[in-house]
Amino acid sequence: MIIKKNQIIVIFMTLIFIAPLVIVMLMYRYDWHPGSHSYGELVKPIIKINVPNNLESAKDSSKKVEVSGLMKDKWSLVYITNECKTICENRLYDLRQIHVSFDKDIPRVQRILITLDKNINKIHEKYPDLIILNKPLEDVSKLALQFDRPSYKAIGSENVYVVDPMSNLMMVYSNKIKSQEIRKDLVRLLKYSWAG
């Protein structure tokens, strides 16, 4: 009886060590990759965002934004709109709530509004830490065009874009995706990312 019990233990221990190897070999042979779940659309290939040199911050029109590092060293949540009406205001509120929920990771993320709207005083009062880029119009348009995708134009799409700390556009969240889902993706991204 002791021999049978010992044999069962040896067989069981062997299976514990061999089973993962067999599973991995089968996954490799049949090119099977378990699906991952993210709510946003991964941008393939990644697009390098080049920020025009003459952009001015809406906070202080006499002072230009430091564009050399605008989308570097931090993750950027970018929202692009023609005019900031109800949908825009709701999305900006959602982005602020997402940002605040990051707790210790707040300094790693910045929010940027790219807009052609000149009347941004109300937005600036509501969201003083939001970076608002709205002039000169030619440079704002050049910047917004870089976010265009083959299936839509960035201006008017009401999408949220994620730019990594190396200025690469990497994810797009359509206007149909809820803020909770965006937050889940970003929390996971910040958890596993060393950048920013």
Model regions: which residues?
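Short, surface-exposed patches at the edges or C-terminal ends of soluble domains, predominantly
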Residues: 60-64, 96, 101, 146-147, ...
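Short active-site neighborhood of thiol/selenol oxidoreductases, capturing the structured segment around
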Residues: 67-96
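Structural microenvironment flanking redox-active thiols in thiol-disulfide oxidoreductases
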Residues: 90-129
